[in-house]
């Protein structure tokens, strides 16, 4: 890797030195003596380091072995393209002669998905590493100083050029875009601050797609980098981030597939950050304007009719009243399954008051509700609303634009760390297999349906973890080397059985529903095979 790093940082004569030096750098990547990949990988690829002339855009590439020794090539390629007055470009490029024989790689949704996550991570890394070196004048710097990587939404779309705004941002690379603008589907500028990481992740991505991982001595580094960029596929939502967003936007909706902990994090926030000020409610198809905002409700009395109607506050006005009574305390209203009700009807004219940037906005209500509310609804500045929404429930109508504009949306994703910490061997393996299927084959619409981590951990896992720690202390007094007793092993066996039962009774029905509803049509065979595997446990 050192020679490749030097190739990208040293000023070389592109015409005379570049081809030979780049070939040497590529060759140094293979073999246990300082290399990163096994030599058998050479059977799958060849180096293309053509001589440079004035008519040719200079490049050096690792391409599929089936290509001819010269001329245009096809398939997936890792390419480094030098330019005279700037850093080289590191890129993934589909050959000008087509994507065959790598159509099974480039055509997968996961190929583009991972390429986009890698470039997002590299941009974040570059911003982080250069932030401390910036001064106040940097606000005037061009986008080229803030963004150094880009990826096409769909790598297979070789009919689409690199967008004009991207090409203008990286104007030093105009000749490259003019020549290979349709074939480039991911690139990173070889800025020194992130160069080593960029080379590794692009190369690792290229060889992983061909079925090769780095050598044993590079495995730790490989997994560290892979885990880092993989987080951009499924970002973690932290309580502090959610709290900051609520303070800034006031009205937030957490959306994600089932089992990702949307309700849990909402209730934890209510208990810890809001000190219990507020309350959780749940919407359903029968939720009405009267139950949420307020209205006339019958009550028995001693009149001739035996009943009368009373103006009664709904769930929203109740918490508004409490927030108005204690303006120095923050209040949180949690609306679980917010999209299960017809929000336009439930909110009515009150939607006009949901304007986070206009605290003075008020709405005249149909009745006088008394108290601090009266007949005018004005959302208190200390009241925040947090909704949760299950993206797997496609039977529910999409929220209309007027409602979406007033809420900030935050995606909740399955978290591999939770499964690794609390799952059993069986559920960890099951999680990673299913995650791989969704990452590789799911469309963007289906990808958000990846079942959450709670399907892969036993319900009492936290108690089991505590018991494990207590048992370990006892074991230390009985046997050395922290050996588990037969009783411990039996308990773990029962926990494994419980975990497998949970997969069969909770996860499989969800996946079957996905198949029946047509949510996973494009990769239903893979899901069907996965279900069969789980059923055989």
Language-model features: where?
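Amphipathic, interaction-prone secondary-structure segments
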Residues: 40-80
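Short, charged/polar surface micro-motifs in flexible loops or helix N-caps
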Residues: 53-57, 65-68, 83-88, 97-99, ...
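Histidine-centered divalent-metal-coordination microenvironment in nucleic-acid enzymes
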Residues: 75-81, 89-91, 454
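Long, intrinsically disordered low-complexity tandem-repeat segments
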Residues: 462-493
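Compact, glycine/acidic-enriched structural inserts
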Residues: 18, 83-160
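N-terminal "first-domain core" detector
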Residues: 1-34
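AAA+ P-loop NTPase catalytic core and its hallmark functional loops
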Residues: 212-445, 461-468, 477, 505, ...
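ATP-dependent helicase/translocase motor core
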Residues: 140-251, 264-265
